[in-house]
Each structure stands twice: as C-alpha cells, then as structure tokens.
Amino acid sequence: GNPPGDRYQSGPLHYFAMLPFGMIWYNGAPAELRDIPLGTHIHGYFLLPPEGEEKTIPAIPNMETYHVKYNHAVSLEDDFSFYQKRGQNWKVVSVDEIKGKINLTPEGKSAKDGINKPYTFDIDQVSKIWKSRKLVDLKEISPGTIVNFNLGWAQGWRDNEYSVSELWLDEESRAFATELQRKKHVRYQKQRWLPAWIDHVENFDYGGGVVTLTLFGGMDKSLYDELKATQEKGFGVGASDKTLRTWFHRADKKIGQVLDWKETGNPPLGSSGIQVRLKFTELLDGYRPGRIVRVKCHDWIFVTMPPEERFKSLEELKRSAIMGLP
C-alpha cells in the first residue's frame, strides 16, 4: 500500500528468519548464510511464519504499515546461482569505463522472477572481473562475451539500479568459483552433520526405540551418497533445533543402526526426499516428532565446534527460538 520510494526511504529493514530446511546457493553451489558477502543482492522465496511462530519476527512499533508478513525464507540465491539454475546467461553489448556502465542482454532461457530484458548496470574499478582463475581489468571485457554476474547496491537502488560486484568472463572462471564454493559447503556440513526432521518415534518398553527422519534438501549430492554408502556402519544423530545449532555434538549424540533407507522423487521444497529409519538402544530427549537433528556419516572425522555454535543451557535453547530485533 506504500509507494516504493516511501518504503525505501522510511521503511525498516526486512527482518527475516531462515527456515531450518531453507536452501541457500552461492556461486552455483550449496552454501551457508555466512558464505554470502554482506551487500550481495539475493533472490529469495519467503513463506508465512509456521503456525505458532507468528511473533518470532514482530512488527516494529509505529511501522506496522511496512511489516512484511512473508518473513521466513525457504530459498536464497545470489544472481550467479539464480540465473545459472534457470538457464539464463548474459551477453555483453558494450562497456563504458568513463561513465561506469555496462550494457548486457539476456541469452538462453528467460528467468521468471528475475531480470529478463536488456539492462544497464553500474561497473567500476572495484568490481571483480574473473577470467580463468584470476582477476583482470575492465578492459578485458569484450562485446559479445557470455558472462555471469553478482550484483550489489547502486545509488539508484530504489529505482531498480544495480552495480556489478563480480563478473565471470568464461566457463573456466565460473566452474572454478562453483567448485570452490561446493568444497567449502561439503567441509562445513561434514563438520556439523546433515540436518534432518524427525517424522516419527517408536519407543520401546525398556528403553531405546526406532526413529524415522527425513534429511533436508539443498545439500551437495556427495554428502547424501556418502551416508548411503556407509549406512551399514550406522549414523550418529545429535539433537538440534530450528537454528541448526547443536550441543557438544561429538559427545551428545547416539549411534543408530539403519533399518531402512527410502528415496522418493520430486520431494517438496526443502526436503531431500530421503527418509531413514534408525534403531537406537537409547533415545535422547531431542528425539521427538517435529524436532530437528543432525546426522553424521560414520567415516566423517569428529570436529569440535566453536562455543558460539553450541547450546550450553536449556535457557539458551529457549531464547534461540525468538528473534531479538535491535
């Protein structure tokens, strides 16, 4: 109900929560929120808060008019990932170093919800221009070159103007950026384990039980493959929460024997489509339907996480459920 200019000048920041099963992509590979540099333009798909969590992100007093109800992110992507995934590239039409402008026209498929028409962007000596595996000068940009980019803020942001923060000139540079991010993501998940949602718990009469869980989607395929290939050795399962933090997970976990591994095609957004049933001789308190856990492959090396990534008390766990606005 507010003109864009009014919202831009007077509205508050768009506070949002990342859903635990939300998926993040950067440079064409799975990522964590920490991987995306501040100031990066991103494409997001947002949902209404889950039932019972409507107050997680409350409206700021006296600014209710600007409150965005769709404030739980299920998907975040930088421009590189967004356009690449949808089959849209860009062709250089012209570059004006003096005026700091680059004209691009879309190539390939037309990306829905993105820029899909010829466009002029800001570009300057601070923009990172990648060719092969190194940075080059603006003069290396030639008309007719097929490129990918990431965008950032520009002075005319309110009027949909953007600056090019990074530009990839060839396939080698793009593949290198993607593989580097993929390796970073794989290392991160192996250290912290794959997140999953508990679907069902069958409690035994004298301790232990069977836990059925579904692994979240958006992870590199190699991680799921390693779990599947070593399932006969059992999985470590540590209790987590919606922030995906754990306790001292290398110790506060139980090993479950895999009874069943089931995969379904075309899973809903946020799901891997992989459901696993595990038998435990003991169950942790966090093994409850609807709760979140993190799952470790037997062959992954134990790594102790820094204290700021761990829960240390039940009070801290409780506080993490509420987003505190500055």
Residue ranges: model-predicted function:
Residues 1-326:
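Short, flexible, surface-exposed loop segments at domain boundaries
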